[in-house]
Amino acid sequence: MLDNLAANEVRVFLWHHKLSRPDIQEYADICVSAEEKGGLSNICDKRFVEKVSVRVILYKLLGKDVRICYNENGAPYLSNKQYYISISHTDGHFALSFSHRKHGIDIERWNSTAKRVSKMFATEQEVAALVDAKAITDEDAKAFCTIWSAKESIYKSHDFAGLSFRDGILLKKDAFSNLVAEVSYKEATFHYAVEYRLLPDCVLTICLPASV
């Protein structure tokens, strides 16, 4: 049921399904802790499916006693703090990652929206280096989706509240053709490595602080 992907020091578990709220309710009865069930009763069907799907993945891996909690900025963490985690979902794809290091993941279904609104999150320098130069993929729409997803995973990796995707994150390829990022935030500079997987109907990006 779960796809298991390894990326450096991160393990990502993916579940793809098209279950509705009534379909997935039986999973909620089994996999969701009593403490969390109260918070699921009054949310919309889409959010219910997203939250339960991620908790099913967690249950399969660590059991029912471990819960997903959220800090003041909305970032998820495990109740036992055994691992750092990150969560993402898009149109029937649900992802949960684990690592002993802070990190971020994002999954985006292939679409044309990212290309249409690219000026909101990508600079001309990034477009020239990564899209026009075919550094990510031969398909422009997929390249823009990957840039957007990479910046989402970077944002999640460090709780960068208020960070500008366009002006605060610069993506490029290093000398070994790896995707790297420089983040400018509150007069400080951070460096990240981003791994990406071009899947049949979506892109998955995984971000970790760059090794020093």
Locate the predicted segments by residue:
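Core catalytic alpha/beta fold that binds nucleotide/phospho-ligands
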Residues: 1-212
